[in-house]
Amino acid sequence: LTLSDGQYASCRKHGFEVRIRDCRTVTPEDYGTFDAIVSVGAFEHFCSLEEYKAGRQDEVYRNFFKTVSDLLPVGGRFYLQTMAFGPKMIGHEAMDIHADNNSDAYVMALAAKHLPGSWLPYGSEMITRNAEPYFKLINISNGRLDYIETIRRWRIMLRSFNVRKYTLY
């Protein structure tokens, strides 16, 4: 399942069965249950800044974990890969698109501008607390430094001149 037309086209091209659909609305009646479910990079888009401000972040995450749990048989596996704010992250009220480009205030404002409807969970504790009624945690790892390097390389490539890149837009 995906919400991305590009991911849909790529999956079809490679012979996968795929549907465009919000995974949070799927029930066992739709497709049955699955032996395993993988979620990569979607979780951080399930809760909006508005829902966070309204105090609904935990509810949004609990509902997601219940939906996934309902789609798995006993003994089924779930893999979640997501980003989360660290313990030193500034509050949403400190976001400032005019702040220094290397500041948390700027990065947060930039993310809110370019990823509307998305707000990260606050730490792995928030994730595990909401998953706990439905899942047993087997492993947790932090790829923060890997992601920082990924972002660094993206910035270099995005800022570099490339004729093909400009013809696409």
Language-model regions, residue ranges each:
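A short glycine-rich, Lys/Arg-flanked "PGG" loop and its adjoining helix->strand segment in the class I
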Residues: 54-75
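A short hydrophobic/small-residue beta-strand
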Residues: 78-79
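Short conserved AdoMet
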Residues: 47, 72-73, 132
